Every structure is written in structure tokens, then in C-alpha cells.
Amino acid sequence: LTKQLHIGKNFIYVVQLFNLIRIDMLTGPLKDLKKPSFSGHETFPLRYGWLTKMMDYFDPEQKKEELRKKSKYFFSTGEKITNLMADFGVGKNMVNSIRFWADKTNIIDTNSKIGMKLSSFGKLIKEFDPYLNFIPTLWLIHWKLCSNINQTTTFYYTFNYFTSLEITKDQLFKSLMQLKKDQEWVGSAD
């Protein structure tokens, strides 16, 4: 009986701790987030070689006019998107996914005066590790992806708040849906 009480006491303690963490979580950066971002990658995971292709495509040695023209291709349809598909050797949805991953890992800057260009982070990687061979480069890219609450909410939440020792799709989905409910996010997919 003493052992059962002890286990029960520990269980209650763990539940109370979890509730404190949950309350704290809702007072952290997630509390102020009004519009989470869960899409944009067209269901494609980040693939080997995509970031390198973007660094080559937006090579900083090119003239501004050429970069401006290339930047516009990413936001167009018809023949221009067909040119991009040929340049990258992928379909239309993959072109959009490549742009998404390059933006969210901060390889490209989408807010420059000329449209898209390599960010200072992208230029540094292109100069010192263009094929992403070094583990520290991959760690930095991972950190960039997981530290942007506004643009990659799932990654931010998973690596900063999700408290399970093992991650399953169902656990993560349920946890995100609970967060959506707690935060009263409207318009997020159920």
C-alpha cells in the first residue's frame, strides 16, 4: 500500500509539473503568436541538394538585373515557372517547396529590394561549405529552421516545447491540436 501511495504521489507530482510547464508555455513566445505557419512546403521534406541548388541559382556574383529576373520566376506561372522547373529538374510543386525551405532556413532573403537573393548566412555557406559537407553547417541550418516561431511553427514547437521522450506523428498532432485549441488559433487545419 505504501508503494502504491508513493507511485500515486509521484504521478500527481508529474501531472502538476506538466500543468506548470503548460501554463509557462502559454506565457512564452507561443502566447503572443497570432498566426502560426504550418504549410508552404507542398508536403515535400527538405531534400539533399536543394539548398545548394538555390545557392548556385542566386549566386551573388550575378548582376542585380539577372537576380531580379530570376527572383520573379518564383512568383510566376506559365513559361517562367516552366523555365524554373527545367533549371532545377523538378516539378512545379517542388519548385515551390525548394523556395520554402531555402527561405525558412535563411539561405535566401526574400525581402530584398531586388526580390530574392542569397542572405548573408547563405553567402557564408556558399563560400565555405557549398555542398553542406560539414556537420556544424547542418546544425546551423537546423537551428535556423527551429528558431523561427512565425514561419515554422511546427519545428519551433517540437524542438522547444514538445516534452515527450519519443515523437510519434499521433502524439505530435494531438499536442499541436491542443495548442491550437488553447491558443484559439483560427484557420489552422484540423
What does each of the following model-derived ranges do?
Residues 9-23:
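Short, positively charged and aromatic/hydrophobic N-terminal segments
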Residues 24-190:
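Donor-sugar nucleotide-binding helix/loop cap in glycosyltransferases
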